[in-house]
Each structure stands twice: as C-alpha cells, then as structure tokens.
Amino acid sequence: MKQNKYDQLFFDLDHTIWDFDTNSEATLLDLYHELKLNEQATADFHHFHTTYHHHNEIYWERFRKGYINREELRWKRMWRTLVDYKITDESLAKLMSERYLEILPTKTNLFANCIEVLEYLKAKEYPMHLITNGFEITQHQKIKNSGIDRFFTHVITSEQAGIMKPHAAIFEYALNLTKSTASQCVMIGD
C-alpha cells in the first residue's frame, strides 16, 4: 500500500463536486414549465429563479439556525416565492416542493474534472468520504445518479449526524466514524 500524507479525505458534495447551482436552476426550469408558472407568475424565468434563490437563502439560514424545521424549509421557500407573484396557493407551494425534491437528485452536473480528480485519488488509495448538509435521501440519490458513489466509503449527512456544518461536532462525528484524528484528515470544500 502506498503511503499518503493524509489517511482520510473528506469532501463537501454541493458546490464542491456536484454543481448545485446548475442542477437547481435546471430543476426549477423544469418545474416552471411543468406547473405553467410562466402563465401564473411571470413570463421571465430569470426573474422567477432570482426570486426563488433569494427566498431559498433566507429559509436555509433560518433552518441552519434552528428557527424552522426541514419540512417548513422545503415548502415555505416555494410559498414565499409564489407570494411575491401574488400567488398564495399553499397546495401549489407544497407540490412545487415535492416535485423539486423528486427532480433535483436526477440532475447530474458535476464541476469540471471532478471525475478525473476522484479517479486519480482513488488510484492513490486515498479513502474518501462526503460530509454534507443536504437531506439524507436526496444526497444519496444525487451521488448514485451522478455515478460518484463508487468513490466514497462514507456519506455523512447533517441529518444523519444530527448537526450541520460548520459545527465542529459533525467533523468529530466523521472522525469517530472513520477512526481518524484531525491531523490525519483533510476537508475539501466548505
């Protein structure tokens, strides 16, 4: 076995390997057409996407701080976007949320050269793992559908660990899981 400087490599998934912004925008565009939001909200998808992105950031921050739960995050970001277009249909917001979470993990855009880098590191026999704040089921679907599941020994989600990055406890959880010390590991992303 080849001796490596680090015993374990940890990666973030979204915004590091999996191109969240591209995949999310493509998902929202699918929803925009599927639910005919161009007729109900605005004919300008770019404006609709910008509005959604604004509310999504606000609701994720509220979720990270513990002000709202997972279910509220999922549908209220959609509802608040619709409200900006004078649509107060809660059932539509909940449908959007369901469909968004169904469609998003089917998108497979990765950042450039990710596969090549992961293949190189695997050939060097680095044990690789993911630490992600995403939802358990959704993250595993993204990984499988993108064909990168073969690279990672452990997928550690905030939902599984019970704590979100950047809190130290999620990294301690990962170290315990891999039986490593911080000096033996490197975190890539976030």
Segment roles from a protein language model:
Residues 2-4, 123-126, 177-184:
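Glycine-rich phosphate-binding loop signature in dinucleotide/nucleotide-binding domains
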Residues 3-111:
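N-terminal helical cap/lid subdomain that shapes the substrate entry/recognition surface
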Residues 10-12, 131, 188-189:
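Generic enzyme active-site microenvironment
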Residues 25-30, 146-148, 174:
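Glycine-rich, phosphate-binding/catalytic loops in enzymes
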Residues 90-91, 150-154, 182-186:
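Short acidic capping loops at alpha-helix termini that bridge into adjacent secondary structure
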Residues 95-110, 114-146, 152-158, 164:
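Substrate-recognition element of Asp-dependent hydrolases with the DxDx(T/V) motif
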Residues 164-190:
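Conserved Lys-Pro-Asp/Glu-containing loop-to-beta segment of HAD-superfamily phosphomonoesterases
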